[in-house]
Amino acid sequence: MTKSPLTLYLAAPRGFCAGVDRAIKIVEMAIEKWGAPVYVRHEIVHNKFVVDGLRAKGAVFVEELDECPDDRPVIFSAHGVPKAIPAEAERRQMVYVDATCPLVSKVHIEAERHAEHGLQIIMIGHRGHPETIGTMGQLPEGEVLLVETVADVARIAVRDPARLAFVTQTTLSVDDTRDIVAALQARFPQIVGPHKEDICYATTNRQEAVKAVAPKSDALLVVGAPNSSNSRRLVEVAAKAGCSYAQLVQRADDIDWRALDGIATIAVSAGASAPELLVNEVIDAFRARFDVTVEVVETAVEHVEFKVPRVLRQPA
């Protein structure tokens, strides 16, 4: 049977960012240095395939520190943690390694610096996301107000409209955040923002690549986990950019082939915590059903690399 032709636009950049790469290395190096088990508070990154792979090597994933014994190392996830968590680990004299992405740590430092100058912080982020919890937890309760939408801006009650600063979660939609920032600046003209926006380079680059491929594709798939904020934003960006069918898939098994019946073009991207192995699996699934021509659409080249903490670079 002759296969139908299909042009597959492969968005670039896609997949692992420097912060995710570093976090995974931290877990692997910790297991190598201290042996199994090494405990990890929260999924190190939001990807089941990655987490299952590390679990097989000896990582034990827990949600809270009280699930960890005092005598085993614990790693904090790439999303960042409230200040109370390392303080508790120190009180218990635990060995811990902080795998917080350096770009998230930068937001933590910004928030603290503004607070030291007497400013109340407004955080643009998603309620309940570990990164938002971690950033808000750098300061005492009530010092950071959360806004998720433009509508929230009109509702928040601030201490002093002239003494405000804002920070953002690093994995948001660039366009949505721009609208929220504009609403904040309209309501609070004296609000102070970051020197350079907090949305990370990888989030921005992946969204721009999706915008480049979405309008010319009959469908677009984002390889990523349902709990991955940046992956879900890529699906939203694709829909807004004019792609009529944009879906999140964890791997090739999740593809709804009936929904793709009759397509001539498809685009594929991947969230920042999705390994390239899963992207290749998706491409292979299309090759099995179509006569595929792959076209890479590259909108940026990334050379960012973050060092692992010194404790893991020293011999045991």
From Swiss-Prot:
Q: What class of enzyme is it?
A: oxidoreductase
Q: Which E.C. number(s) belong to this protein?
A: 1.17.7.4
| Binding of (2E)-4-hydroxy-3-methylbut-2-enyl diphosphate, residues | 46, 79, 129, 170, 228-230, 273
Top-rank taxon of the source lineage equals Bacteria
MF-aspect GO terms:
4 iron, 4 sulfur cluster binding; 4-hydroxy-3-methylbut-2-enyl diphosphate reductase activity; metal ion binding
Question: Which GO annotations describe the biological process of this protein?
Answer: dimethylallyl diphosphate biosynthetic process; isopentenyl diphosphate biosynthetic process, methylerythritol 4-phosphate pathway; terpenoid biosynthetic process
Function noted in UniProt: Catalyzes the conversion of 1-hydroxy-2-methyl-2-(E)-butenyl 4-diphosphate (HMBPP) into a mixture of isopentenyl diphosphate (IPP) and dimethylallyl diphosphate (DMAPP). Acts in the terminal step of the DOXP/MEP pathway for isoprenoid precursor biosynthesis.
Question: What family is this?
Answer: Belongs to the IspH family.
Q: What is this protein called?
A: 4-hydroxy-3-methylbut-2-enyl diphosphate reductase
Q: Which gene encodes it?
A: ispH
